[in-house]
From Swiss-Prot:
InterPro entries: Bacillithiol_biosynth_BshC (IPR011199), CC_BshC (IPR055399), Rossmann-like_BshC (IPR055398). Residues 437-457 form a coiled coil. The keyword Ligase applies. This is Putative cysteine ligase BshC. NCBIfam families: thiol_BshC. It comes from the Bacteria. Keywords: Coiled coil, Ligase.
Amino acid sequence: MHCTCVRQSDLPNTTRLFADVLYHPDKTADFYQYPLRNLEAYQAAAAAIDFTPERRAALIAALRVQNPESPALSRLAEPGTVAVVTGQQVGLFSGPSYTIYKVLHAVKLAKWLSDNGTPAVPLFWLATEDHDFAEVNHVWVFDSHHHPRKLEMRRTALEQPVGSVTLAAPPVPELRATLHGLPFGEEVADLVEETYRAGSTMGKSFAELLRRLLAQFDIPYVDPMLPAFRELAAPALRSAVEAAPDLTSQLLQRNRELSDAGYHSQVHVEDHTSLVFLLENGKRLNLRRAGNEYVHNSRRFTAAELMDRAASLSPNAILRPVIQDSMLPTVAYIGGPAEIAYFAQSQVLYRTLLGRMPIAAPRTGYTILDSRSAKLMNRYGLEVTDFFHGETPLKERLASRLVPPRLGDTVRATTATVESAVGRLRAELAAFDPTLAQALDRSARKINYQIEKMERKTAREAMRRDARAASDAESLCGLIYPERHLQERLYSILPFLAKHGLDLPARIYDSIELECTDHRVMVV
């Protein structure tokens, strides 16, 4: 097993804000309270946490409901112990594989802090409150040939928090069929079948599967929908409603500051934006601010009425981390690019509501390759970044290597001859009539285009005649950049476990380097 690195700025769709957070932190310092990867910053963030014994005891009691056997809770109960938090939506069959990478990064950072004098434990926040079922009702896996396959829960759950959605017929048979032929496919399918049982919920099954997959790591899970956590969240939610006009004004100003710095805002905010939803009758109701009132369809609520029902409120994406950290002694949050961008906006909410802010630490990202795929890439002279232009350009590149050398030499010689002849003609035309030289330039571009077009056609024909190369290209694209997405953002961890074994998370954990800001390419 070995790893190489790719700069995050070389990955598709990396925002300027995220790239600057990683590689030019001085440019984003105004939007984050602490720098990254600095022991003194973590110590300062830990020292800023004012967590009373009463609050700590209430937190431990709430955590024990779902984590009764976790030794980490005994450590968290000790004064001064801080939390390294990460979290994710409770997606089908554990969601995208980066979920696992976030958890493992949190575990490693907590250990590093503990080893360096700041006692810390990892915590995983289950985003059970979210109500966008379409974001979590599916999962992508691949088969033994790296053909992507989407598995889906075909039902609706309008306005219902996804964590409480009951499983009717989870697509375990389809998963088993897709993983068939992979060395550990049956073992992985059995594990999923045991955790995603009909009658369970999305939240419970997600947590149980992660607990089983990461059994060697002691990670307590936080379910904000549990009554004990609703009560713990209530004071901060009450404060957010009370200060809503001022908070909205601060967010609008922060968005202008981000825009002036050349960055975009992750969350759109307007004057009527509500920072909270209302949980009622098993649904998460959208609210809109209208003056001093909140509106849902034809219903109206005063701020005072919502404050009286604070335990039934649910934060929106930009307020959520603040509410989370009002309940937890969070020293750092491990997040992906979008989450790190949230913090640039949320900083103003942290400042007003908590008076402190954790370090926003980008998670480690991975592209995982098997040894055969790595050898194929070496054979064709490919890097991971070569796949980000899509399958067609990649196939053309592979195909160009299959063109008979003599034919390739002839094409290149023809191109050189034409360019030389056109150059001589252009020089004489320019002396005679410059407009004719300009007309020749246009014609030359057309000639070059036609030669390049013929070269691509020749390469495609060579690819058609070489079935193995075509198959290799399809397999590599399906593994590395499936459906034009980064591997970690599309595929679940499950097919990788089915291919490499259930000890893969331990191997990934060992490979994490906290000081590395780059995306890692890991050959297993």
